[in-house]
Amino acid sequence: MDKSTLKQLIDQAAGRKPADTIIKNAKIVDVYNARIIEGTLAIADSRFLGIDAAYTADNVINAHGQYVVPGLIDPHIHIESANVSPAVFGSLVTPHGTTTILADPHEIVNVAGMRGLEYMVASAKNTALDIKYTMPSCVPAANPTLETSGAVITADEIKQSYDQGLTYGLAEFMNYPGVVNADDGVLDELLVSLNARKMIDGHSPALHGQGLNAYAAAGVHNDHECTQVDEMLDRISRGMYVYLRYGTVSKNMPTLLKGVTPQNARFCCLCGDDLQSVTLRETGHLDESIRVAIQNGIDPLTAIQMATINTAQCTGLSDRGGIAPGLKADFLLVDDLEHFNVNQTFIDGQKIAANGAYLLPTDDSVAGFDDLLETVHLDNFSADQLKLNLTSDKAHVIGLQSISRTQNLVLPVAHDAEGDFHYKPSEDIVKVAVVERHHLTGNVGVGLLSGFGLQNGAIATSIGHDSHNLVVVGTNDADMVVAIDALKACQGGGVAVQNGQVIATLPFVIGGLMSTEPIDSLIAHQKAFNTICHEQLNVTAQFDPIMKLGAMPLDVIPNLRITDKGLVDVTKFEIIDINA
C-alpha cells in the first residue's frame, strides 16, 4: 500500500469521502466481543471501513436483516482429498462461505516433489479463494526405510519454498518421533522454519507427557489429530491450538466439543483436513462444521469464532478473521446463525458466490504440467509378486478399528502347502498389497486385512497416503493383478474387478490423485463407483472404498499399516514379519 492509497482509505473510513459499497439493514457479527451489531457496514478498495449509519456509497447492498459474518478460514486441509484441482476446489468451498484456506499439498508433493507444489500454486491463481500453502514437512511421512515415496523433501527444499514465496509455513510434522528424538534432519527442517519465523503445524496422535512437551518446545504450534478430550486439553495447556476436525471420514469434532469451555474456546479452530468433493457439494465445508458445533451445544457466536478470528490469530493472518476497519473485506450473508445457510460469499468486497453457486469462470487447465499426467510407473505385474510365506497358523492382520486408526490383530489364518494365504469368505480376511509406482523398484508389500467386507473381487487405487503407491485388496490374486494393470492403464484413480473383468473405473490422472472431469460428472462417477463396491463386492457399507484403502499405508497413525516395504508396526516404527 502506498501513501495515496492509505490516505484514501483513511478519508473514506473517516467519512470525508464516500465508501465504495455499503451494506445496510445488516446484523453484523462482532467476533471480538461475541455480539451482534445492527447497522450499516462500509467497504472500500477490498477493505472494511467500519460500521456507521452515516456512511454513503454509490453501491448499496440491502441485507434485509441478514447476518454479515467474517469469511471462514480453514487452517488445515488437503485439496487433493477432494480429487480436484485447486481451481475447482475453490468453486466448491466458496459457496459455503470459505474465503481462505491453508492447504498442505503433501499428497502431490509426495508424488512429484517441487514440481507438484508448483502446479498447485499455479492452479490456485485461477480461483477467488485465497489459498495459502504450507510446505510438506515429511516426504516421505516417516523414515524412508519404511516406504518409497516419489520424492524426498529436505530442509533445502523447504527453504527454497520460503525464499520463492511459494509457501506460508511448515505443514503437519507427522514424524513426531523424529522431533521427540531430535533427529538431525528433523532439526534442520525445524530450524529453517523457526529462523524464517514460519508457523509449524503439528500431527501427534496419542503423544503425551514429556514427548508432547518436547514436541511443543520444538516450536510446533497446533495439532489436528486429537481424538479424545484429554488429548485436546493436554495440547491447549501447552500453549498449542487444537484444530477440531470434521472431514468426510474423520469426524473428531463432536467428541472434542465436550471439552470446549468459555475459558479455552479461543484456542480451538475448525478444520476439514480431508473432504471429498461429494461432501463439499452436498453437505458443506466449515459451514457444516459450524452447524454441527451448534447442534452439539456450542454457542453460535463461539462456533463462528472457531472458524474465523481464532484461526486468523492462530495462523498469523492478522489482516482477516473479523469485521473491523482496515481488514480484508471477506464476508458472507446468512439468514440466521443457528442453521447457518450461506446465501452469498464476498472476497475482497466482491461477490463471488450466491445461492450455492460459484459466480466466476473456473479454469482447470494443466497446461505446462503434462508430466503430472503420467505418474504411474510400473513394469509387468504378476501374481507371483502377491505371494505370502505363512509359516505359522497365526498372522499379524490389519484390523479396521476406528475412523483413522487400525489394530494389530493376531488371528488364525488358513494357508496352502506353499504358505500362501487361503481366502475364506466367512472370516472376512483378505489379502492387501502396496505396489511401488514411482521408481520401478519392484517393491511389493503384502499383508492381510480384516473388516473390509470385500467378497469375490479386487479393488485398487493410486491413493495410498502419503507416498501414494498403489494399494490393492482382493479375495484372489488374479483379480488383484487385473486391478493393478487397469490402474496403470488409466494412470491412477480407482478400479474395481470381479471374475477377471473391470467393473468400475474412476480415473484421477493428475498425479494419480486428482481428476480433470467436470465436477458434476466426477461426483456422479464417484457415487457409482462406491455403489458397485458396496453392492457387488460387498465392501462394508459405511466405508468409502478408496478413502479407507488409501489410509492403509499411512505409517504415522497407529497401529499396524502396510507399505511397499511390508507391514509396519507404527508403535515401534519398524517393519515386522507377518507370521505371529
UniProtKB/Swiss-Prot annotation:
The keyword Hydrolase applies. One of its GO terms (molecular function) is adenine deaminase activity. Pfam families: Adenine_deam_C, Amidohydro_1. It is an enzyme of class 3 (hydrolase). InterPro entries: Adenine_deam, Adenine_deam_C, Amidohydro-rel, Metal-dep_hydrolase_composite, Metal_Hydrolase. Gene3D superfamilies: Metal-dependent hydrolases, Urease, subunit C, domain 1. One of its GO terms (biological process) is adenine catabolic process. Its cofactor is Mn(2+). It catalyses: adenine + H2O + H(+) = hypoxanthine + NH4(+). The keyword tRNA processing does not apply. Its EC number is 3.5.4.2. It comes from the Bacteria. Keywords: Hydrolase, Manganese. PANTHER family: ADENINE DEAMINASE, N-ACETYLGLUCOSAMINE-6-PHOSPHATE DEACETYLASE. Belongs to the metallo-dependent hydrolases superfamily. Adenine deaminase family. This is Adenine deaminase 2. It comes from Latilactobacillus sakei subsp. sakei (strain 23K) (Lactobacillus sakei subsp. sakei). The lineage of its organism: Bacteria, Bacillati, Bacillota, Bacilli, Lactobacillales.
